[in-house]
Amino acid sequence: MRIPVATKLVRAHTYAAFVGLILSALFGLAVSIKFHAPEFLTNHAALTWGRLRYDHTQGILYAWLGNAFIAFIYYAVPYLTRRTVTSERLGWAMFFLYNFVAVLGGWTLVLSGVSQPLEWAEFPLVVAAVIELCLGLMIVQFGIPFLKCGASELYVSGWYLLGGLTFTFLAYPLGNIVPHALPGAMGAAFSGLWIHDAVGVFITPMAVAVEYFVITAVTRKPIYSHFYSMVGFWLLFLVYPLNGIHHYIYSSLPMAAQHVSEAASIYQGMDVILVVTNLLLSIGLATEGSVLRDVPMRFVWTSIVLYLLVSIQGSVQAVMTFNSFIHFSDWVIGHSHLAMIGFASFAAMGGLGHLWQRMPGVRHNRRAMAWSYWLLVVGLGLMVIDLTGAGLVQAALWQQHLPWIESVRASRPYWIFRTIDGVALLAGFIVFGLSFVTGPRNPEGFVGVTLDTRPQHFPSAEPAHFWFTTAYAVTFGAGVVFFVLSFLALGVYPAFSLHASIQKSTPPGAHLMLTAAEQHGGHLYAIDGCAYCHTLQVRFTAADAWRFGMPTQAWETQQQYPQMWGTRRIGPDLAREAGRRPIDWQLVHLYDPRYIAPDSVMPSYPWLFQGSPEQPSQDALDLVAFLNTLGRAQAELVPAQPKAAYVLPVAAPANDTEEGRRVFLANCSGCHGENADGQSIGGRSLRPVAFNLAGFRLSDALIWKTLEAGMPGSAMPSWNTLPSSEFRAVADYLASVGQPGELAPNEQYAPKDVLMEAGKRVFATHCVRCHGENAAGDGPDGIHMLPRPANFHQMMPSYPAMAVILRDGVPGSGMPAWPLLTPAETQAVTFYARSFYSGPGDQHPIATGASSARMEAMR
């Protein structure tokens, strides 16, 4: 009796895997392009960065790797068990449910704004339920044939496949459902479990199973040590889940759990060294040149080497000292690409290539597959090097007292190069897919085993130990115990510990509850992927505390369902955003971030507005309302930590207006305009509108004070994080840009003494209540205003700039329009206000009297 392979299901899942791979890679390429061309595909919510990023990661995990490994399992089960899968009819039902409901449905829902902000669990709960159902069906489909075998007959690939399916079925709900039931820090503990379990108990067992299977099938030799393979298998399921919390080191999670995760990460590296040694020695004992001759074997060998590299890298970056430096940077993104594209995808490609060579009636192009191998090796290698370099640069800049935008600017060349690498990877994926549909066609024939043949592997000559040959109950029970241990140690324990800590530490009267509008804003923040650029956790590190403020406490997160701590920072952390910037700034920044910061790579959100930043929809207002809840409870109870004072350079360098203009264009032109006239779209949308720097001569004291401390009541932030040389350069530039000029004699409505007295009368009538009798901005009404009225001792307006202000007012400030003033009165009050200026520049006499101060005496 012959045991056939379900070849139609193998083909179906293989083709589905290729479609998923190409689409997922296109999602990723679009995401990469948006880093250096943020306006690319930006006019529709479905194409925003966050949603495409969600579909990229979920597509790689489920559409590509999931289908690839399922196809391989269909091929491998008859060889490993000498039995067919449970039911081909069940297989087709599972195929359509998995691909058309879970994957395609998940992609569609994410793009339409239905998702969850959980790493590697972005598909919404309704799709998560379908995936969990599919995992259960996989256990029925593939697990039953394995369970009918004796433990002593099961090859190590079977152990990995069965263990991966079983423990993924158990772990998947922890990262997808529990964070919705446990808020903030408590939910983060379970999210951390799934972040690592997605790789550790799903991807890794499948990939290693492929490697063990292909090695013995190609070399026709036994593996080096069956004992080592079993030790590596059980250590994997013991240690890997314990790694989860290393994604949240220096957070408010219990330090004991963080230390366990750190230690487990190191032990995981040791386990991988054991597994990789066993795999490589198995190849080394084989016929010379097998790796070079067999292209799928080449993919497998590369996967094994990359498995070692990525695991050692993961162990190193989990060490707390190094983690405090490198976490949240592109180093981590390079690490994840090395894992998912390098280790996992190369293993999947090796497995698919191996089985496709043996499938009847299909085309196979060995040369195209070999070309794809080199395209992928080069593309992946360059990408990992590029992202690693970017991460080191970002981490170094974050440790310095520099504006956040400096790390974005420094990353731009790396991000451009990553897109080039991404094109190489996409080309490699396409060529790999073409190798399955071009070339000569394989002959028709039977694929499978017969009852009188052994599987295409050979048991190790090493004597089997007794505990390896006992019933499934012992070894499987040990695995369940290991899984429960990780669940208790890094899920339940932190949650209970945090619950008790939160009960004790929550201050009385803490403002934690969110309004319906704020909750809706949080939902918008989640579905658009904001948590994948901005973390919501200030870590307990000196660099975080200096830059963002007080570290995030667990009690502050009790209303976050689910938590959105994040694992990457492209933009700054927002955990202390409440009250930091005015609402008008937030709205302009949402509409188009480059209106505020020209070098920003944040996507714009025009669909949240009715054509301009001054016409926000309710969604935009709700999103801003949510941003202003972040850190609100702490801010209301604890005084904000003072920022480090700016230390002025001792020696004043030579004035460098070119350097100052460069700094101005990079940091200030978004609001103030390229000509410093306040006429940018973003600047005119702010309230108060951006200041017309070109229309005023400003004193050095005012410039330096404003750059150092910002302008309270306006969107003008502090720039005391600029390097001292840039700070002085832009200050010098601002001192030079305002050229108020003088009145030509033929432009004067009256002699200067008449202008002075007339202006004094207009000022006393209309301006003194706010600007004060001495025009110092300290009038009885002005002292209650933010921003404070102009202090004319520190600024000299030009006549055209003052005329515009008197005619139109300053929208968003206490300065009203005075449209009834005549041109002569406008000139007179401007002349009078200019007379108070005491900074550098032309001085104007203050007249003590005039022969006539009547306006009718002015021509």
Question: What are the roles of these predicted feature ranges?
Answer:
Residues 1-2, 286-290, 445-468:
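Membrane-interfacial, low-structure loops and terminal tails that flank and connect transmembrane helices
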Residues 11-36, 49-83, 88-112, 125-145, ...:
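Hydrophobic cores of alpha-helical transmembrane segments in multi-pass integral membrane proteins
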Residues 30-45, 183:
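Membrane-interface helix-loop junction between the first two transmembrane segments
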Residues 117-128, 153-157, 186-196, 254-265, ...:
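Non-cytosolic membrane-interface motifs at loop->transmembrane helix junctions
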Residues 513-536, 546-553, 654-675, 753-776, ...:
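Sequence/structural segment immediately N-terminal to covalent heme-attachment motifs in c-type
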Residues 511, 515-518, 543-627, 685-735, ...:
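Extracytoplasmic electron-transfer domains, predominantly the class I c-type cytochrome c fold
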Residues 457-501, 603-657, 662, 674, ...:
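Extended surface/linker regions that mediate inter-domain or inter-protein docking
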Residues 501-526, 540-541, 545, 633-663, ...:
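Electrostatic cytochrome c docking/interface patches
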